[in-house]
Amino acid sequence: MQISNLRHYPTFADTIADRGWHAWWTESGVPIENYRAHVHLMLEKDGIPAALVAHDDDRYIGSVLIIENDLDERPDYAPWIAALWVDPDFRRQGIAAQLITRSRAHIAQLGHDTCYLCATADKRPYYLKQGFTLLEEDVAGLDVFSISSG
């Protein structure tokens, strides 16, 4: 398995969009085409936004997005680790942790000291175990975390 910037493996863009939209956006009213366009923007330049993809050659395993803002209620926090996804067959193998580590490194290379993440409260134990600090609870129904990028 390797973790690559989506810019180097653009064939995974639609898969990343599909997984993310089905996991978090189906009930939002946002069309999948809009979410797909958001992911395709990550192919255009280095920096933020970006996507990292875990894969075994041409087999998708998981992905994570690095974006400017993942929570409208907290516009001052940036950048964010978002849409962390590992396909069910590959879970509990440390892949999500590796995607987080690579995201943090990418964010650090861009000169940011801290990154943020939001998740439902049931995910809190996982993110605390990964070294995140809980900043706030129940912001639009989500926990808000931070972690050093370095």
Q: What residue ranges belong to the model's regions?
A:
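A short beta-loop-alpha structural element at the N-terminal edge
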Residues: 1-16
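Active-site rim helix/loop that mediates acceptor-substrate recognition in acyltransferases
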Residues: 24-52, 61, 65
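Conserved beta-strand in the GNAT
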Residues: 51-53, 59-69, 80, 85
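Residue-level recognition of the GNAT/N-acetyltransferase active site
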Residues: 87, 120
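Conserved acetyl-CoA pyrophosphate-binding loop and the N-cap/start of the following alpha-helix
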Residues: 90, 94-102
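Conserved GNAT acetyl-CoA-binding A-motif
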Residues: 107-119
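Conserved catalytic-core motifs of GNAT/GCN5-like acyltransferases
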Residues: 116-118, 128, 133-148
